[in-house]
Amino acid sequence: MYSAVRTMNKKIVVIGGGAAGMMAALSAAEQGAQVTLLEPNERLGKKLNITGKGRCNVTNNTDIEGLLANIPRNGKFLYSAFNRFNSADAMNFFEKLGVPLKTERGNRVFPVSDSAFDISAALERRLKALKVQVIRDRASALKIEDGAVCGVVGERGRYSAEAVVLATGGVSYPATGSTGEGHRMAAEAGHTITPLQG
């Protein structure tokens, strides 16, 4: 996904099979990592599939400044991330996965099919092609030894890892599985959680 791809030989566990989790798993696998993706829902991308009224607004076809202008608070925080993977990169990524896109009013980008399922299905196909192991399990805790995260404890098993990516989402729309457990696990690992403001 990035122009400068490093080769890594690490065992990585990604917690969460939404858009962020799938993208993190793909990025790590494309760089040579052995990736396990933990997701408790029957399907990956459950919230992704209902975004944009089921159409999935993939990105906005604009430059970095245009993206940042639409972020209500502290958008500059995302500048380096958008500099590494911007709107054009996102559009190219999905078109290479076989999802034709269209730009509509307000520079909003959607699949030509108007179906969010096409986005999640394309991500799932790529995960499978890269041999990402998808396990239906709910992470309950991070395994921490000597102050370092070294794995994940799930309801059905334990998963060792050299790195763990928390991509569980927030607490919006709990019917999709967003319970905030990632925030709890991050806090238990010593991270500071800043409350979201409306």
Feature annotation, model-predicted:
Residues D118, A122-G198:
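Predominantly flavin-linked oxidoreductase catalytic cores and closely associated redox partners
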Residues Q31-A33, L97, L130, A189:
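Conserved dinucleotide-binding and phosphotransfer motif residues
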Residues A29-K53:
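Glycine-rich FAD pyrophosphate-binding loop
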Residues K10-L37:
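N-terminal Rossmann-like FAD-binding beta1-loop-alpha1 element of flavoenzymes
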Residues R55-T103:
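Glycine-rich active-site loop/strand segments that organize a redox cofactor
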Residues L78-A88, R105-R125, V171-G177:
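Short beta-strand to alpha-helix junction loop
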Residues M1-T7:
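N-terminal amphipathic/basic-hydrophobic helices that include classical n-h-c signal peptides
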Residues N9-K11, E104, A161:
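Phosphate-coordination loops involved in phosphoryl transfer and adenosine-cofactor binding
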